[in-house]
Amino acid sequence: MSNEEINIHEAEEQLSEQEMLRRQKLVELQEAGKDPFDVYKVERTHSSADVKDNFEELEGKEVKVAGRLMSKRGQGKVVFADLADLPGKIQLFIKIDNVGEEALKEFKTFDLGDWVAATGEVFKTKMGEVSIKVTSFELICKSLKPLPEKWHGLKDPDLRYRQREVDIITNPEVKDTFIKRSQIVKAIREFLDNRGFLEVDTPILSPIAGGAAARPFITHHNALDIDMYLRIATELYLKRLIVAGFEKVYEMGKNFRNEGVSVRHNPEFTAIELYEAYADYNDMMEIMENMIAYVCEKVNGSTKVTYEGTEIDFTPPWRRITMVDAVKEFAGIDFNEIKSDEEAQAIAKEKNLEFPKPLDKVTKGEVLNMLFEEYGEDKLIQPTFLVDYPVEISPLTKKKRGNEMFTERFEGFVYGREVCNAYSELNDPIVQRERFEQQAREREYGDDEAYMLDEEFMSALETGMPPTGGLGIGIDRMIMFLTDSSSIRDVILFPTMKPQK
C-alpha cells in the first residue's frame, strides 16, 4: 500500500458516520450522472425576499430560487422544506403530483446543508405562508459535512470564530451583524466623499513602523534583503499627501499591532485616518461627532443606540473635558497644583502606577495620562472628547495655544473605551525632529512602543505642510457599539486565533 493510499485510509477512518453516508450519496449521484459539482451556473430569477415582498405580483407565476436546504418536513406524497439564501428563507412545497414519484424519492435523500435550485409556482399555504409549489429541482452542491443539530448559533465562542461560515449559516443574527458592518463602512465613506475627501491607498509594508505608539509585526523582504514592518498606522504617508497638495484625504484599511488579544483588541484591525489642510483639532471634533451621527441615522434610524443595556446618545455635540479636569473629577488630584516631575512621581508611587521605564525618568505629563487611564477612562460612558494631552505622549501634535505643556490632541471615548484620536498636526520639522529624538531615548529606556524616526517623512515635512487637522477612528470598535456586540471578535469576520493543534 502506498503512502498516499495510507493517508486516504486514515482520513476515511476519521470521518463520522454521517460524513461517510453523505460521501456515499455523492458517489451514487455521480454514478447516476447527476454530479452536483458539475453544475457551473444557476439561472435564479428571484431571491426569497423578492418572492415574499412581491407576492401579489408573483402569485401563480413561475420562479426559480436557490439556496441551502435548512429543514425538511413530511413523508409520504408531500414534503415541505426551507431553503435559505442571503435575505432569508423560502418554503418549498414538493408534491408527488407535481414532480413525480422518482423525483420526490430523490429529494427525500437530500441532506440538510445541501444546496438546491428549485423551480415552481408562487402560492400561499393554508397557514398563510408564502411558498413555492415545486415542479422541478436540482442538487447544485452536496454538503459533505453535516451542520450541527438543534443550533441557534454556536455555543462555544472559540468554535464560532474558527468556523465563522457555519456560525453565519446557523445564526441569522451573526449574518445581520456583518451586513450592518458593510452598511456602516459604506455610510462612513459616503459622509466623507460628500465633504470632498479623496480616498487613497498607502503602503501596508514599510521600512519604518511609524504614526502610532505600538509594537509592530516584522517581516523580511527577500529580494531587497531588508526587514520591513506591517503598518501600525497610515498617518505619515497621508501627511505626505497633504504636503503634496491634496487638501482632504482619507484611507480605510487594515493596521497591524503585535500586541495582546482581548474583547477590545485584535492584532489585525480596520481603521480610518483622515487629514484636512487648513483645519485643526476643533474641526476634527466636528467631523467625528457629525459623521457618527450620520452613520447612526443611516444604519439604525436614530442617533441613540443601546449597548449592553445602556443607552448611548451620539447626538452632537459630544461632551468636551480636558485631561486635567478629568483627573481632578475622577481621581481627586488637581494637576494645576503639581509643579514638578518629582511631585508627580511621588503621586505615581503612592498610587502604585506602573510605567515601561524607571520611575525617576517619568514626567509629570506621563503621570497625568496614567492617572486618567487608571481612574477616569472607564467613567466616560456617553460620547466624550478628552482634550489637551501632555506634550510628552503626543509627539506628532502641535502644542496647545496658550499652554505649551499640553497639545491640541483629543481622544473620543464611548462606554469607557477609546474610539478615535485626533490632532492639530505638528508641521514644524525642527520641533518634530526633536520629538522623534526624544522618542528614540524612550526606546532606549525600554519602551518598545515609542515612535521610530522616519527620515522620508521628515524630508516631506521640511518641504512644507500647511496647518492640518488629522483624525483616526477604530472602525471595529465603532461597529461594536452600533451592533451591540460585546467583543471585537463578534464584528470581525475571521479574528486572529491561535492555531489548533
UniProtKB/Swiss-Prot annotation:
* GO BP, one annotated term: lysyl-tRNA aminoacylation
Gene Ontology cellular component terms for the protein in this record: cytosol
Annotated positions binding Mg(2+) 1: 411, 418
Q: Which UniProt keywords apply?
A: Aminoacyl-tRNA synthetase, ATP-binding, Cytoplasm, Ligase, Magnesium, Metal-binding, Nucleotide-binding, Protein biosynthesis
**InterPro entries named in the record:** Aa-tRNA-synt_II, aa-tRNA-synth_II, aa-tRNA-synth_II/BPL/LPL, Lys-tRNA-ligase_II, Lys-tRNA-ligase_II_N, Lys-tRNA-synth_II_C, NA-bd_OB-fold, NA-bd_OB_tRNA
Q: What is its EC number?
A: 6.1.1.6
Q: Where does Mg(2+) 2 bind?
A: 418
What is the UniProt remark on how the cofactor binds and its stoichiometry? Binds 3 Mg(2+) ions per subunit.
Q: Where does the protein principally reside?
A: cytoplasm
GO molecular function, one example? Answer: ATP binding
Superkingdom to which the source organism belongs: Bacteria
Catalysed reactions, as listed in the record: tRNA(Lys) + L-lysine + ATP = L-lysyl-tRNA(Lys) + AMP + diphosphate
Q: Which cofactor does it need?
A: Mg(2+)
List the subcellular locations: Cytoplasm
The entry describes its oligomerization and partners as:
Homodimer.
Q: Which family does it belong to?
A: Belongs to the class-II aminoacyl-tRNA synthetase family.
The protein depicted here goes by the name Lysine--tRNA ligase
Record organism:
Clostridium perfringens (strain SM101 / Type A)
